[in-house]
Swiss-Prot record:
Gene: gch3
Additional remark text: This enzyme couples pyrophosphate hydrolysis to the guanine ring-opening reaction. GTP cyclohydrolase and pyrophosphate phosphoydrolase activities probably occur at independent sites.
Name by which UniProt lists this protein: GTP cyclohydrolase III
GO molecular function, one term: GTP binding
Family per record: Belongs to the archaeal-type GTP cyclohydrolase family.
InterPro entries for the chain: GTP_CycHdrlase_3 (IPR007839), Nucleotide_cyclase (IPR029787), Rev_trsase/Diguanyl_cyclase (IPR043128)
Highest taxon, organism lineage: Archaea
Any one Pfam family match given in the protein's UniProt record, by short name: GCH_III
């Protein structure tokens, strides 16, 4: 089971134009700061936040309880000129979890309802003994094939084409995908196999002539899974595996490191 928290700024659209439209540069900076602060706050508890549309964010929050969510919510109220609402849900797949959380939040009223403030609810249950699977996907040799050859905007356009293709393909497996900068994407993907990813990569390569690779991490929290995914991706880059996917599981990884005589102090 994966635990997802949907985060939404309360009544944000009307606030941006009241009493007059606010400077766009200020709004962009404010949204970026909120994303950064939320990642730091949830990250302190081994969670991970993705910005989606900036006024609506999705966080992977396995291991994070309701009290911690409440404290984060209060901290945002104290730091920002607006409030946020949060709903937590769990499911076998990321898409199912975020959908359930979203539907529960919508039951409290519109995102632009001035009377709906600081909703905090659990749609079904908090995850006690679940896991997180995250794939860190990137484009093979984007520097040599795009960055150093075509314009900055054309590279950006191609990256977004790949992003959309990945989002549509992964949705067939009830997985999610988020852009995380450069040519990198992260996909919460509980239940997917390496073969599923290879099939998707082959279809995208046939259509766009772009090769992809992915480290896949499976851990108890978003931080554990994403760290393992990063290590798996480095194994592919270092040609330590013979295919474009590499899966690392938390317990297996810790056992292999301990067996090499290294001392680890995992925080579970």
């Amino acid at each position: 089971m994966i635990q997802i928290t949907v985060i939404q700024i309360d009544n944000y659209g009307p606030w941006t134009v009241t009493p007059n439209p606010r400077r766009e540069s200020d709004l962009q900076a404010l949204q970026s700061r909120l994303y950064a602060d939320l990642n730091l706050m949830f990250g302190a508890h081994k969670g991970l936040v993705f910005y989606t549309r900036f006024d609506n964010l999705i966080a992977i929050t396995n291991g994070i309880d309701l009290i911690t969510h409440k404290r984060i919510q209060e901290s945002i109220r104290n730091r920002y000129p607006f409030t946020v609402s949060m709903v937590i849900a769990s499911a076998e797949t990321p898409y199912e979890a975020q959908k359930l959380a979203t539907e529960t939040l919508q039951e409290y009223g519109s995102a632009q309802d001035e009377n709906r403030k600081e909703v905090l609810d659990v749609a079904n249950e908090l995850v006690v003994d679940g896991y997180v699977q995250i794939a860190h996907i990137d484009i093979n040799n984007i520097t040599g094939t795009l960055t150093d050859i075509v314009s900055a905007y054309d590279t950006y356009l191609n990256v977004n084409k790949v992003k959309l293709a990945l989002m549509e393909e992964l949705l067939k497996y009830n997985a999610l995908l988020f852009f995380i900068g450069g040519d990198n994407f992260m996909a919460p993907s509980n239940g997917m196999s390496e073969e599923d990813f290879l099939d998707i990569f082959n279809r995208i390569n046939k259509k766009y002539k772009i090769e992809l690779k992915a480290g896949i991490g499976i851990g108890r929290t978003a931080e554990d899974a994403s760290n393992l995914a990063d290590i798996g991706l480095e194994k592919i880059r270092g040609k330590l595996v013979d295919k474009n996917v590499c899966t690392l599981k938390q317990d297996d990884f810790l056992e292999s490191k301990m067996g090499m005589g290294k001392i680890y102090h995992p925080q579970f």
